[in-house]
Amino acid sequence: MILSRRSFLIGGSAAALASGCRGPRFIGSGDLRLGVISDIHIREPESAETTERAFRFYRSRGVDAVLIAGDLSDWGLLSGFRILKETWDRVFAGTGVVPLFITGNHDFDGWHYGDMTMEMHALGYDESEAAIKLGMRRCWEETFGEHWAPVRLRTVRGFDFVSCEWGADGEFVEWMKANGGRFRGGKPFFFFRHSPLKGTVCGRSAGDDAVKAVLEGYPNCIALTGHIHYPFNDDRAIWQGAFTAISVPSLSYSTAPEGHENGYDDRTGKSKLTMPLMTVRRDLRGDQGYLIEVRGDEVSVERYDFDEMEDGASDWSFSTARDAARPYAPEVRVREMPAPVFPAGAKLKVTTTNTDNRAGHWTIALDCRFPSAKVAGSRVFDYEIRAVPKDGSEPLVKRFLSPAFALMEKFEPKVQRFWFDVAELPQDKEYVLEVYARNCFGRASSPLVSAVRRGKPGLGKAVR
């Protein structure tokens, strides 16, 4: 008999529990099973197709609730809320599954974000139905049929969920002064807002440190945030300190961390980057989310890819008990996550190519190709290429992301490719190229090193 992966896990968990060992997923009464997504960015009805696909997956897995950590509507329009409600009702009407939704920045002001405005008008919508203009409370309560407030407490199967709406950090701090004693018992509870908490998960925060300071008094807190659109392939998406924080990836598209040659840059056509923008952004790929299961103070987080409809990476598991180990604390990850490794015999191949740079200008590029690296138990975060002068002067350092950085590992190319604009390279001096693969905490592989190279003077004579 051939068992599906899910059947195997159910059977395996039952056997593990019977023998006194914790299995990889939790089964049975008393559990909380929670679907978690973020940044669904609904525009017109067609844009809700991925959200509906995620909802149907969560229904098939018997969730008790589905949490969306903000940016429900791309343009902050009432129609976006209504499309979400219609999508929810098609899947969950009459099931008792609880919606746990909050607002993000787009739900308040996406209707005046430059290019968003162009798209909105092109598709036949306008700011006259902006929820913030019509009244956020009114739009929310009329659409979703539930009370809206800057801070809300909702309970699902005995587990508390405290939500903090966009811009409501101060209200949350005051609310916790009056209500924080409720969460002192040690049972896991969830805090969720749109932007990350400073000093926790990857990405830039858009909030006040005061919220983090409050949560530091609750080791049983699991904080869920969205906003940054980073994929869960980045293992900095989970953080443990005085509490646990998890960054929820976007269900609509992934974005790239700053500082990479094939990442984001000037959008006015004045970019000076040589490499083209990764297609993952143009193709709007990277639809990801979580299935969280809780039993007692034990938590398992399944990372799911809704493009491929399969697990996108290995589970995270931890305990919220006060004296429990913190396996996802940054200092532990830095120490224990191994450096990437290139395949045995890997070589760096270098040639030149005629191409256009990001701004569309003709460029001669040094075309560097080498095999993809791997890191045990995780993914390579990025690659660093250095042009290192032999005379000890300052090297030229560039970083780039694999074109599959936001996708499942099976899409990782066998060969990575990087372009240097030859005008940037050392002239009239010897240098070598060094290539390093790095994990998300900055630990680097041993380098691939080119033969010694020497550029000749004369690049200044070229017409550019």
Predicted regions and their residues:
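Short acidic, glycine-rich surface-loop motifs adjacent to enzyme active sites
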Residues: R184-T200
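Beta-strand-rich modules
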Residues: L425-G442
